[in-house]
Regions:
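Alpha-helical support elements that line or immediately flank enzyme active sites
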Residues: 28-44
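C-terminal binding/interaction regions
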Residues: 115-117, 125-126
Length: 130
């Protein structure tokens, strides 16, 4: 096998190991995944949620339509979708199977529960300016 073929096969193998299917834009989906995972760990639906994320994620998600939510947009919608309809076992396809009745539940959750979004400040990230 030629060196170029070995390199090619190595790259293909890395891609097979590292790439995972995702439903829509990965940043809101990542928030849905985290929210779904948190709900699973808590063992109940939380009545309030604090989301501390980097300014870049805030900027990239605040106006994005969250898949399978009938046009809901933004961080809060992504989090609520994960809490109400997410399946954390599906990782980045966490909200691929949202049912119509769950969309109403997501909207109700957004209306009646508190989701606070704050810029995350760490030594690595620094102060976010949003």
């Amino acid at each position: 096998m030629a060196l170029d073929e070995i390199k090619y096969q190595t790259y293909v193998q890395i891609l097979k190991e590292e790439l995972v299917p995702a439903m829509g834009c990965t940043e809101p989906i990542a928030l849905s995944y985290c929210a779904s995972k948190a709900r699973d760990i808590l063992g109940t639906t939380p009545t309030r949620c604090l989301v501390e994320i980097s300014g870049n994620i805030i900027k990239n998600v605040k106006s994005v339509i969250v898949p399978n939510t009938n046009g809901l947009k933004g961080i809060e919608a992504a989090v609520a979708a994960g809490i109400i309809a997410g399946n954390a076992n599906k990782v980045l396809e966490v909200i691929a199977d949202v049912k119509k009745d769950q969309i109403k539940e997501i909207k109700d959750y957004l209306e009646h529960n508190c989701i606070i979004v704050r810029p995350l400040e760490t030594e690595q990230i620094g102060r976010a300016h949003v």
